[in-house]
Amino acid sequence: MKENYVAAGFKKTVSERFPAEADALNAMFNARLEELRAQNAGASPEKLRHLEGQIMPGVAAYEALQNVMPKDEALKTIHDYVEERAWKLKGIFQKIAGFPGVYRLIPGLFVKGTRKMFGESAGFAAKEIQTGKGVWRIDMVKCPYHDACVRYGCPELCPCFCDSDDITYDELHPKLAWHRTKTLGRGDDCCDFCLKIKAK
């Protein structure tokens, strides 16, 4: 199985910058990750995808890094991991969106994808505002990223994941508009997502 990108980034950071403490930091990261897994053992497969993919490694790495660097630097380090991955994803999505006519399908794919991978079983709750005619517009009122970061005492970590959405989906295609003014992770009442085909 491919190594989680946060775990890989963490290992690289500690081996390059803190070689003397690397073994202890990796052990700390792994122990905390196992502890988080035990605490979330009852999570649904849909929610585990998010927990294992980003949330739990993010929390474990953030906590471990604070043993060798200031809190704000640890936060920036995690943000860098997330941002690097977001730019890679953006490149892939831009290539797909660049095929003739594909951009027209993307809002509809967001509708289906949100319902499948970002639904209640995954720990999300969305209010659909408009999901048709070239528009995907929802208010996400519950998010497991936000909930977990608050639960584990690091609400400041959540905006790292919020920012990744903006990096990945903004300017996917010249004829698509990405818009969001609020996020739960930044203290707002919802994440007001919108992706739509631009008016002619």
Each predicted region: which residue ranges?
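Secondary-structure boundary/capping signal
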Residues: A22, E73, L176-A177
